[in-house]
A protein has these predicted regions:
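Non-heme Fe(II)/2-oxoglutarate
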Residues: 1-95
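Catalytic core of non-heme Fe(II) oxygenases with the double-stranded beta-helix
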Residues: 75, 79, 83, 93-215
Length: 215
C-alpha cells in the first residue's frame, strides 16, 4: 500500500530512521546450513550450492517486542508509526492483526547478499522510509515466494509470488511463513537501504489476502 503516511509524517520518520545508529551483525537466517549464494536479480534463476557456516550479516537496530518496551527504550516514534499504520491501513479489519510482537530496523548496503528466510510471528509488515529511493536503478525491493517449505533443502520448489519495489512511504505486508528476502542494493547506489520491520500477531487471516494491496 502506497502513501500510508501523510507527507509530513513520512518525512519525519525518514529523518529519524536515517539519523539513527545501527549495529553490525544482523542475520537474515539464524541457522547454520548449506545455502545458495546470491541469486540473480528478482530470484529468476538459481545459483549453485556453496557451503556456509552461518548467514550473511547486515546492520540492525532492535527496539523491543511491544509498545511498553518501545516507550521504555525512548523509541516512542516506533509506537506512533505502528499506530498510524494500524489505523491508516485497516490492519484489524482487513487482516485481523491484533498486536505488534517485534520491531526493528534492517539496513543493507551494496555488496551484502541477504538470504531467503521465513519470519516468526503471524504477519510481517515492512515500511519503506526513504522517500527519494531510486528503485529503478538502485534495486533494494522485497521478493516473496511460495509455497511454504520445511527448509533450504527444498528451496528449488519455490516460485515467486510477488516482487515489491522499494518506494518511499510504502507498506509491504505478508504472512510470516512466506520465504522472502530484501533484494540486493545496486553498485551505483551510494545510499544504505533502510526498512522498518514489524512482526505481528493476528487472529485468523490467510495468505490469499496478500494481493489486497497490489501496487
Amino acid at each position: 500500500m502506497d502513501n500510508v503516511l501523510t507527507p509530513e509524517w513520512a518525512r519525519s520518520i525518514e529523518n529519524i530512521v536515517m539519523s539513527g545508529s545501527y549495529k553490525w551483525g544482523g542475520k537474515s537466517l539464524s541457522m547454520s546450513t548449506n545455502y545458495y549464494p546470491l541469486e540473480l536479480p528478482k530470484g529468476l534463476k538459481w545459483g549453485d550450492w556453496e557451503p556456509k557456516s552461518g548467514p550473511n550479516y547486515h546492520w540492525i537496530k532492535k527496539f523491543g517486542h511491544n509498545e511498553k518496551d518501545l516507550i521504555k527504550s525512548g523509541n516512542e516514534w516506533c509506537v506512533q508509526l505502528w499506530e498510524q499504520l494500524f489505523i491508516n491501513c485497516n490492519l484489524k479489519e482487513h487482516f485481523n492483526i491484533e498486536e505488534m510482537i517485534d520491531c526493528y530496523v534492517n539496513v543493507h548496503t551494496h555488496g551484502q547478499a541477504p538470504h531467503l528466510h521465513p519470519d516468526n510471528g503471524n504477519f510481517t509488515l515492512l515500511y519503506y522510509p526513504q522517500l527519494n529511493w531510486d528503485y529503478r536503478n538502485w534495486g533494494g525491493g522485497t521478493t516473496i515466494w511460495v509455497p511454504d517449505i520445511d527448509g533450504v533443502e527444498n528451496i528449488e520448489k519455490l516460485e515467486i509470488l510477488e516482487h515489491v519495489s522499494y518506494k518511499g512511504n510504502r507498506l509491504v505486508m505478508f504472512d510470516g511463513w512466506h520465504w522472502h528476502r530484501p533484494e540486493p542494493v545496486a553498485r551505483v547506489c551510494k545510499e544504505a537501504r533502510y526498512v522498518v520491520v514489524y512482526k505481528t500477531g493476528k487472529d485468523g487471516g490467510n495468505s490469499e489476502r496478500l494481493d489486497y494491496y497490489d501496487n
